Amino acid sequence: MVNEFEKLQSGKLLLASANLLESNFKRTVLIICEHNESGSLGFILNRPMEFKVCEAVAGFEEIEEPLHMGGPVQVDTVHFLHSRGDIIDGATEIFPGLFWGGDKNQVSFLLNTGVMQPSEIRFFLGYSGWSAGQLEEEFEIGSWYIAEASRDVIFSDAYERMWSRSVRSKGGEYQIVANAPELPGLN
């Protein structure tokens, strides 16, 4: 786990460590979409909200998929990750086959006409952000792990198992961590 922070870059998964108990990030899996000297930005993948995209986002009245809590920053903003950078203008590639943002009106049209499927996009309310040096400090106290990302993880609906599966994918000692109870003091 030494120098784990040095592996962090856009397109990696950020996994809350088993001892990170802060409610916003407890057992979360995030995709990092931006990481540079100014800070880091990502979205929580395993926190679907109680309401659907069609109930909260204008122009997407036909989309019955859940909206996801992207993080505690600017929770009045909507963001999206998708796999269709080939047909959405202004999208930023995070890794091959995964894109962030783009023309919202174009996305609405593509979804409403069936050119794009709801399974190819994930919507988030707010985001997770860290200023310069903040995330590095959190790594130093053991709050986070890094793992490889894939489109399968990004678009998975297995929210309850996403954290343990992602931690387990790191192998070795992480396989034990992945099976740790949420509140070991109660055992």
Curated annotation (Swiss-Prot):
Gene3D superfamilies, per the entry: VC0467-like
InterPro entries in the record: AlgH-like
GO cellular component terms, semicolon-separated: cytosol
Superkingdom of origin: Bacteria
Family recorded in the similarity comment: Belongs to the UPF0301 (AlgH) family.
Name of the molecule in the record: UPF0301 protein Cpha266_0885
Organism expressing this protein natively: Chlorobium phaeobacteroides (strain DSM 266 / SMG 266 / 2430)
Lineage: Bacteria, Pseudomonadati, Chlorobiota, Chlorobiia, Chlorobiales
